[in-house]
Amino acid sequence: MLALLAAGVAFAVVVLAQDKPLPGSHFVCSAIPPEALFAGCPLPATPMQGVSLSPEEELRAAVLQLRETVVMQKETLGAQREAIRELTSKLARCEGLMAGKAESSKDTMGDLPRDPSRVVEQLSRSLQVLKDRLESLELQLRTNASNTGLPSDFREVLQRRLGELERQLLRKVAELEDEKSLLHNETSAHQQKTENTLNALLQRVTELERGNSAFKSPDAFKVSLPFRTNYLYGKIKKTLPELYSFTICLWLRSSASPGIGTPFSYAVPGQANEIVLIEWGNNPIELLINDKVAQLPLFVSDGKWHHICITWTTRDGLWEAFQDGEKLGTGENLAPWHPIKSGGVLILGQEQDTVGGRFDATQAFVGELSQFNIWDRVLRPQEISNIANCSLNMAGNIIPWVDNNVDVFGGASKWPVETCEERLLDL
């Protein structure tokens, strides 16, 4: 085709050369070697002979060969279109120059004038032939692209393979939809399970903080304060009336060192140390009333259960200290003639710097407390001994030890307590 294009251009130049060369126009004609005639139309590579390939490899090679053929034929079509455009442009230039020459110039050589219409007509015919051949080539390329020279069995294999891939794709889409639905269901189930677990934990925490109602009796529980912090504590819901004497008894177990901390404290507005029992650092256990101090000869930091009772009366500030049913100390002048003020806050496990708060972790009680009772009188020594040896179970008439009267906070907890006899065996 390129040879035909070159012949057309050469023919136009030869015809025009019979007259005087046109001013300002120069055309260069170059010979095209025969081997260049097919340079723009490379043939597809033929498969290697004598090499045994699997059907999948032959199919893959055929597809690659088809792709390369289509790409090369597209490039050839592009080059041929460019050549046609260039030839059309030159033809237009020739027509314009010939028209101007016929109007303004004369034949100075005495030759007969040329017939421009014949030249244009011949060039048009040549161009039409080129266009016809180009359209034929494009049709052939489309035919080759749609019906390649691959063997029929390869085409069947290709079609079967494409059909199989389509079916696999549809199955995969269906599987993904099923997995999506299953994942949604599993996520919902997992979310429900998580919510149930959280609700159970929340209920358990609430039970620990507010008390467990599953005790054998309302007083068969203990408060556990396992760590020395400023946020674990118990609180007695009831408050004290104005008192002129009292007896406070409790069971406790602690192995904290140094000092067991503060088993209980009672604070009123204007006096944070209205009643406090504390063992702080290496000091002995102390009883504070209205911020006045008395040291008590009690020793309870051996990790065993001990029964403690303290009596006090405003008359002469007389006090007594009992451990495990035995009186170990007595004294007087502890806040004499001072009545215990009413309306305060009673805390288990912490010393109060303000009413109901400002706890100090170094003064916190570490251990277990139970049977915390308060009476508005001084109990007789025999009563205290009977309570300690489990022969008498007597609740406080001011503050009794009952489940619904004790709240716990900050991780403190309530647990069933050992029986009185079991506590005695632990002495």
UniProtKB/Swiss-Prot annotation:
<dbReference type="GO" id="GO:0046872">
    <property type="term" value="F:metal ion binding"/>
</dbReference>
<feature type="glycosylation site" description="N-linked (GlcNAc...) asparagine">
    <location>
        <position position="185"/>
    </location>
</feature>
<feature type="binding site">
    <location>
        <position position="353"/>
    </location>
    <ligand>
        <name>Ca(2+) 1</name>
    </ligand>
</feature>
<keyword id="KW-0325">Glycoprotein</keyword>
<feature type="binding site">
    <location>
        <position position="353"/>
    </location>
    <ligand>
        <name>Ca(2+) 2</name>
    </ligand>
</feature>
<feature type="binding site">
    <location>
        <position position="273"/>
    </location>
    <ligand>
        <name>Ca(2+) 1</name>
    </ligand>
</feature>
<feature type="glycosylation site" description="N-linked (GlcNAc...) asparagine">
    <location>
        <position position="389"/>
    </location>
</feature>
<feature type="disulfide bond">
    <location>
        <begin position="249"/>
        <end position="309"/>
    </location>
</feature>
<keyword id="KW-0732">Signal</keyword>
<dbReference type="InterPro" id="IPR051360">
    <property type="entry name" value="Neuronal_Pentraxin_Related"/>
</dbReference>
<dbReference type="GO" id="GO:0043160">
    <property type="term" value="C:acrosomal lumen"/>
</dbReference>
<feature type="signal peptide">
    <location>
        <begin position="1"/>
        <end position="17"/>
    </location>
</feature>
<dbReference type="Pfam" id="PF00354">
    <property type="entry name" value="Pentaxin"/>
</dbReference>
<feature type="binding site">
    <location>
        <position position="363"/>
    </location>
    <ligand>
        <name>Ca(2+) 2</name>
    </ligand>
</feature>
<keyword id="KW-0106">Calcium</keyword>
<feature type="binding site">
    <location>
        <position position="351"/>
    </location>
    <ligand>
        <name>Ca(2+) 2</name>
    </ligand>
</feature>
<dbReference type="InterPro" id="IPR001759">
    <property type="entry name" value="Pentraxin-related"/>
</dbReference>
<dbReference type="InterPro" id="IPR013320">
    <property type="entry name" value="ConA-like_dom_sf"/>
</dbReference>
<keyword id="KW-0968">Cytoplasmic vesicle</keyword>
<comment type="subunit">
    <text>Homooligomer or heterooligomer (probably pentamer) with neuronal pentraxin receptor (NPTXR).</text>
</comment>
<keyword id="KW-1015">Disulfide bond</keyword>
<feature type="binding site">
    <location>
        <position position="352"/>
    </location>
    <ligand>
        <name>Ca(2+) 1</name>
    </ligand>
</feature>
<comment type="function">
    <text>May be involved in binding, concentrating, and sorting soluble glycoproteins or glycolipids that are destined for the acrosome.</text>
</comment>
<keyword id="KW-0479">Metal-binding</keyword>
<dbReference type="InterPro" id="IPR030476">
    <property type="entry name" value="Pentaxin_CS"/>
</dbReference>
<feature type="binding site">
    <location>
        <position position="351"/>
    </location>
    <ligand>
        <name>Ca(2+) 1</name>
    </ligand>
</feature>
<feature type="glycosylation site" description="N-linked (GlcNAc...) asparagine">
    <location>
        <position position="144"/>
    </location>
</feature>
<protein>
    <recommendedName>
        <fullName>Neuronal pentraxin-2</fullName>
    </recommendedName>
</protein>
<feature type="domain" description="Pentraxin (PTX)">
    <location>
        <begin position="219"/>
        <end position="420"/>
    </location>
</feature>
